[in-house]
Amino acid sequence: MADSNSGGKGGSGYGLGLSTRTQVTGYQFLARRTAMALTRWRVRMEIEPGRRQTLAVVASVSAALVICLGALLWSFINPSGQLNESPIIADRDSGALYVRVGDKLYPALNLASARLITGRPDNPHKVRSSQIAQQPHGPLVGIPGAPSEFAPTSPASSSWLVCDSVTSQSGAGAPASVTVTVIDGKPDLTGHHHVLNGSDAVVLRYENDTWVIRQGRRSRIDASNRAVLLPLGLTPENVNDARPMSRALFDSLPVGPELTVPKVPDAGKPAGFAGAPGPVGAVIVTPQISGPQQYSVVLADGVQTVTPVVAQILQNAGTPAGNAPVVVAPSSLAKMPVVNGLDLSAYPNGPLSVRDIRDNPATCWWWEKTGGEARARTEVISGPTIPVKASDTDKVVSLVKSDGSGREADRVFFGPEYANWIEATGNDPGSSTTESLWWLTSSGARFGVENSRDARAALGLTAQPSPAPWVALRLLAPGPTLSRADALVRHDTLPTDMSPAELVVPK
């Protein structure tokens, strides 16, 4: 048998190739059979107790290992928790919140209060209610109405809008209602939403005054002064059909010079420079070889270039030089001193392109500031609706204390790249002041935050807050101040909300 494998190298045998696998397994079988004959007095080999015992041990160890791994996984998914020294504790069954002070557990009104009391930004440690019941308890503590959600955002730019939506009531002569919406985040400028630029304008009414809104600000206009209305391209319909403006939008828009007949000092008196073509206040026109004619007005110490609109307004109001502008040759005009005594920044270069308020009942003041820039950018948006995507209109939150007065926000929307950790700043685009700190909730409420390192660290608000104009921030529903002193208060009962609103349950 050995001779049959002596010529093969690297075959299927063991060791030096002196035996085959079949020979080895046969030998092992004979050894097991001999052992069974000596111990069991049997040689039929129907069963092998030793192998069964080995398999049983392997199966038991495997089952125990699987059970242990399953228990470990379940402890991560649904931990039972231990009280230990955790400062903030939550009942795993009911969700009730507790804060540990000394050797007692105090029911906490909210997470903000619990964090301020402990001075740590910990999340609640969930334990069984039976463990909580074994501990000594104290009364209710914390700030009523404080938030329990803290996930600060850090957008690259801060964007805020104050929007008016005018809705006409049914019936002839019925007053129009104005809904104020505050948008925190980027507006949707698709569709028919239009940013006013150039000669674009919106005409709105506040109380008894009419205002022309353009270039990010508002300018008052006398609705009865046709000498001004006609050159500006404003029709009686534009003025008479002007829709109301809320106090919120009125305060947001910076005021510009009034659109009226420019007041020329010492009008009618002789000019004080040589070669004056007429008295102070006279309008002069200079023909040009190419391009439109150039208009100027005579002042006491020189001439000031004006737009055709301003020249027409002055001419309509009547000038000391008569009903027609004085024609001055370019060579003569070049010898006259040039001055800038009149502020004419509110007047456009040409007639205004007034947006039809019936087709565009929504008007928004937009404030945006990018991180690292010194100045904010302000613009006015006009459109058929507020600049929110149609798919997101159901996410607009209606505030409970909405009264339609226009002094507070009726609705709030958090758009793309919104900011909820805020520092208030001035309304001027160049304002660099940083005032109070605020935390905003998804329900549209604002909470003042104590401006101390300990309070900010306890609430987990250590990132740099985003700027927001106070004129928009103040429109949100105010909440209590988040400070440690206000959190360290015990209560037997809580005050009742004196101005609640009914929750309508769908049938």
Language-model features: locations:
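Short, surface-exposed polybasic-aromatic patches that bind anionic ligands, especially phosphate groups
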Residues: 1-507
